[in-house]
Amino acid sequence: MNATILVKIITPLSIALEKQAKIVTMSGEEGMFGVLPSHVPMIVSLKAGLVQVYIDDMHKSENTYLISGGVTEVTANYINIATETAINVTNLSEAEIATKLLDLQKTLSDQH
């Protein structure tokens, strides 16, 4: 399967990521889900967590972002993820990502 889907992670200040991908996974309010090219259109509320962008079929994430929650719009050709905060954690260890997630969750709870 050579088809790809355009994924954008958009914050109020910038486009954090704009890339063609084979698979994108993220955390919705109902749990983790993945999106492949030609997916049925949908709009999903997202929880704070990881967005993983897979560039090839080997299931190794090329780009990983920690987001503060938000909403995603999915069509057959693109995925738009709108979020307040997107942190590129691609090159961090699992422990470093866990620490950043805890920090982000604390920041979000302090805002409410």
Swiss-Prot record:
Assembly: F-type ATPases have 2 components, CF(1) - the catalytic core - and CF(0) - the membrane proton channel. CF(1) has five subunits: alpha(3), beta(3), gamma(1), delta(1), epsilon(1). CF(0) has three main subunits: a, b and c.
Organism encoding this protein: Rickettsia rickettsii (strain Sheila Smith)
Lineage, broadest ranks: Bacteria, Pseudomonadati, Pseudomonadota, Alphaproteobacteria, Rickettsiales
Domain of life, per lineage: Bacteria
Keyword Transmembrane helix (UniProt): no
Locations listed in the record: Cell inner membrane
NCBIfam families, A to Z: ATP_synt_epsi, PRK01474.1
Annotated protein name in UniProt: ATP synthase epsilon chain
Biological role: Produces ATP from ADP in the presence of a proton gradient across the membrane.
CDD domains named among the record's database cross-references: F1-ATPase_delta
Recorded topology in the membrane: Peripheral membrane protein
The entry's keywords: ATP synthesis, Cell inner membrane, Cell membrane, CF(1), Hydrogen ion transport, Ion transport, Membrane, Transport
Disulfide-bonded cysteines: none
InterPro entries cross-referenced by the UniProt entry: ATP_synth_F1_dsu/esu, ATP_synth_F1_dsu/esu_N, ATPsynth_dsu/esu_N
One Pfam short name: ATP-synt_DE_N
One cellular component term from this protein's GO annotations in UniProt: proton-transporting ATP synthase complex
Molecular function in Gene Ontology: ATP binding; proton-transporting ATP synthase activity, rotational mechanism
Family: Belongs to the ATPase epsilon chain family.
